């Protein structure tokens, strides 16, 4: 070892070189330590001197190896500052510190044993010192101390004590870390054991429930079988009893007939029979004659016989054949007089309501005043209708959110249909028939617009079969409240929203894609009982010159006639982009016509209020876009409200996930839902739906080729690992840069206060 030097193999990295040096020194140290243990009983000072010298040589070997590593890998700052740039080498450097301490301890022990053999006190001389200096606690000295001069022993001892202290700290930190890892491992094993116990408990519970259900099913089948057998026995017993009674009656009659015939032929009657008297003297006084009796008679024949008897009685056909028996039959016929036929029931049919409007409170007061002047006879005749009115008012009061709806035509109040949110089939059919009749009336009296364009609007743009309610939309509480205040309440109670409280004529919903803007528009139309026009660019654009403008004009005309109505323009940025010099002439004409018709809504409302004192132009233009900054300035001015529809927050995502998984077989717990919700930060509503669909496909994929023969009930439920796998495929569709852009536009132009 004294003549050997550490050599670094080619293509070795810094970590590999340090590891090679450490393994060589570690093996040499183990051999010398074993030699000290084996020579402990021997007092040969020569052996201990060799061991002491070899340990010094080992320290010199380590020193030269570290210096060579520094030189080879050009470590200008030394190995002490290596951890700053290479934190992965901290462990090997700490191992060198601990190994240096072990070598010094072994050397001190060999020195002590050698001194005991010579009978002189040991000298704490050190020819070489392997340790780390002060500073960050990870700095190697440039040169290891060599030599054993007595004037430097004190300094060497102090330095060695400092190095030992650092090594002890490293040992203590490693011990604490190992204890911490051991504790974490034990805790993990305990958690696994608890989960295993819970799983076993659930399986046992499921098995017990299955066995109990199976046993109950067997008992039910057994009980039904016993009941069936009991019924069969009872039926057999009843049949046998009837047969026995019939047989007994037949034998008694036969014996009585035989007895009467024999008594007549002999002319002798027993004295016991003479003493017997019957209570029915009249019937028994005559001669007994047996006549064949019909055992059964059909109901139709009985009715025909009764009708025949009644007709004969009316015509007097029986008077010529009157006899004692005939008088008795007439009495029977008179006794059973047929009842007169019942009158047909009067079915009341409600008149068709053409258009529902709001009943004004002043009209109720006028009706109450006029009812006081009605004569008493008319009041008595109308008492029944008044009771119906009271009952219907009580029914209407059960729905505080819906106002009283009356017809625009002169229809009695008791015959006016109610529109409720539940939407029974009869009410929906009546509403659809009313809408159809209104459309026919409007098409018959079209003025100022093209009739064909109106028909195209009704066929392609009018939506009547989609019903979406507030409960179908998760979250977005602020947007719902703003829409209720700005649209729903004014449409349902226009008598309260007049003047400065007049409802807005334009509202813009903007935000990232997949946040539910289209569903909100449909929910507004449903909740406000409005006619819904869903407009897209393809429904208004035409290749013929001037046709697009006609369609726009017809759209607003039909919206006014079928008010209250909502014109919903999805992706409105495609139709109302900012105008420029390079724009096409046809698209500019469409924008101009759309803006003109839009501006006419406010003036049309004022004129209709002045003429008819009714609200016939409750029309709202509702737009949705993902690019609000691309809309023309004039169109943006007409949007009185601009609502930002953000991405769903934590609570909304949790509620949406639970609603998606409510009708799907799954084994998810509340903690699983919360974990999935945290993992889907930044997902939109459509992204969550796509994620749930992808997770629902995982149990199907596990079946593989067994899919065609698998039982649906035996397919496993959705687990949290399915969502983890789905997250590898489904990513969020909105970037943070896009969200920042939406928030900046909302703070600049949006209706933040609503």
Curated annotation (Swiss-Prot):
One of its GO terms (molecular function) is ATP binding. Residues 255-269 have a biased composition (Low complexity). It holds the Pfam family AAA. Residues 219-269, 317-439 are annotated as: Disordered. Keywords: ATP-binding, Nucleotide-binding, Phosphoprotein. The keyword Magnesium does not apply. Signal peptide: none annotated. ATP binds at residues 511-518. Disulfide bonds: none annotated. GO terms for cellular component: cell cortex; cytoplasm. Residues 317-332, 361-389 have a biased composition (Polar residues). The modification Phosphoserine is found at residue 255. The keyword ATP-binding applies. Residues 239-250 have a biased composition (Basic residues). Residues 219-238 have a biased composition (Basic and acidic residues). Belongs to the AAA ATPase family. Present with 259 molecules/cell in log phase SD medium. This is Probable 26S proteasome subunit YTA6. It comes from Saccharomyces cerevisiae (strain ATCC 204508 / S288c). The gene is YTA6.
């Amino acid at each position: 070892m004294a003549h050997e030097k550490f050599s670094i193999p080619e293509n070795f990295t810094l970590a590999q070189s340090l590891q090679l040096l450490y393994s060589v020194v570690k093996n040499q140290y183990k051999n010398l330590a074993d030699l000290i243990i084996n020579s402990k009983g021997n007092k040969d000072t020569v052996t201990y001197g060799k061991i002491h010298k070899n340990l010094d040589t080992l320290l010199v070997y380590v020193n030269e190896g570290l210096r060579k590593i520094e030189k080879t890998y050009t470590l200008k700052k030394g190995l002490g500052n290596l951890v700053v740039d290479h934190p992965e080498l901290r462990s090997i450097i700490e191992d060198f510190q601990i190994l240096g301490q072990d070598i010094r301890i072994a050397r001190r022990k060999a020195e002590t044993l050698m001194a005991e053999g010579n009978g002189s006190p040991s000298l704490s001389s050190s020819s070489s010192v392997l340790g780390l200096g002060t500073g960050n606690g990870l700095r190697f000295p440039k040169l290891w101390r060599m030599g054993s001069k007595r004037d430097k022993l004190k300094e060497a001892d102090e330095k060695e004590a400092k190095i030992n202290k650092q090594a002890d700290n490293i040992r203590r930190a490693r011990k604490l870390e190992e204890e911490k890892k051991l504790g974490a491992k034990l805790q993990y094993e305990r958690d696994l054991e608890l989960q295993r116990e819970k799983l076993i408990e659930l399986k046992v519970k499921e098995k017990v429930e299955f066995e109990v259900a199976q046993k109950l099913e067997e008992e039910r089948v057994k009980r039904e079988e016993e009941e069936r057998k009991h019924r069969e026995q009872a039926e057999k017993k009843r049949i046998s009893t009837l047969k026995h009674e019939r047989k007994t009656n037949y034998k008694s009659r036969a014996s009585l007939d035989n007895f009467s015939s024999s008594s007549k032929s002999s002319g002798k009657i027993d004295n016991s029979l003479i003493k017997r008297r019957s209570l029915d003297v009249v019937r028994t006084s005559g001669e007994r004659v047996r006549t064949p009796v019909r055992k059964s008679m059909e109901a139709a024949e009985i009715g025909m016989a009764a009708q025949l008897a009644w007709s004969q009685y009316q015509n007097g056909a029986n008077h010529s054949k009157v006899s004692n028996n005939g008088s008795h039959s007439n009495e029977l016929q008179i006794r059973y007089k047929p009842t007169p036929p019942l009158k047909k029931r009067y079915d009341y049919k409600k008149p068709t309501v053409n258009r529902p409007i709001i009943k004004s409170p002043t009209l109720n007061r006028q009706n109450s005043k006029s009812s006081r002047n009605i004569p008493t006879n008319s009041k008595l005749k109308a008492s029944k209708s008044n009771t119906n009115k009271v009952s219907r008012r009580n029914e209407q009061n059960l729905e505080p959110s819906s106002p009283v709806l009356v017809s625009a035509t002169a229809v009695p109040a008791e015959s006016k249909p109610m529109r409720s949110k539940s939407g029974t089939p009869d009410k929906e059919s009546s509403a659809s028939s009313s809408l159809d009749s209104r459309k026919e009336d409007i098409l018959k009296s079209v003025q100022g617009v093209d009739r064909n364009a109106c028909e195209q609007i009704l066929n392609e743009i009018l939506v009547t079969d989609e019903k979406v309610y507030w409960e179908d939309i998760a979250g977005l509480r602020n947007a719902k409240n703003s829409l209720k205040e700005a649209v729903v309440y004014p449409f349902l109670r226009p008598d309260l929203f007049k003047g400065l409280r007049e409802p807005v004529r334009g509202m813009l919903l903007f935000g990232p894609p997949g946040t539910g803007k289209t569903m909100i528009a449909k929910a507004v139309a449903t909740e406000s009982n409005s006619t819904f026009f869903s407009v897209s660019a393809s429904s208004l654009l035409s290749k013929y010159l001037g046709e697009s403008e006609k369609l726009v004009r017809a759209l607003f005309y039909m919206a006014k006639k079928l008010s209250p109505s909502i014109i919903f323009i999805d992706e409105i940025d495609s139709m109302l982009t900012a105008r420029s010099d390079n724009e096409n002439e046809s698209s500019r004409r469409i924008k101009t016509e759309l803006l003109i018709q839009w501006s006419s809504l406010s003036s049309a409302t004022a004129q209709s209020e002045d003429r008819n004192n009714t609200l016939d132009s409750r029309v709202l233009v509702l737009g949705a876009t993902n690019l609000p900054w691309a809309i023309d300035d004039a169109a943006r001015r007409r949007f009185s409200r601009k609502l930002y529809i953000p991405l769903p927050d934590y609570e909304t995502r949790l509620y949406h996930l639970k609603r998606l998984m409510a009708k799907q077989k799954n084994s998810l717990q509340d903690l699983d839902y919360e974990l999935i919700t945290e993992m889907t930060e930044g997902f939109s509503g459509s992204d969550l739906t796509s994620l749930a669909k992808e997770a629902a496909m995982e149990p199907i994929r596990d079946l593989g080729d067994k899919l065609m023969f698998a039982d649906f009930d035996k397919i496993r439920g959705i687990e949290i690992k399915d969502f983890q796998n789905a997250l590898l495929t489904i990513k969020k569709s909105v970037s943070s840069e896009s969200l920042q852009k939406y928030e900046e536009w909302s703070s600049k132009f949006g209706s933040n206060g609503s």
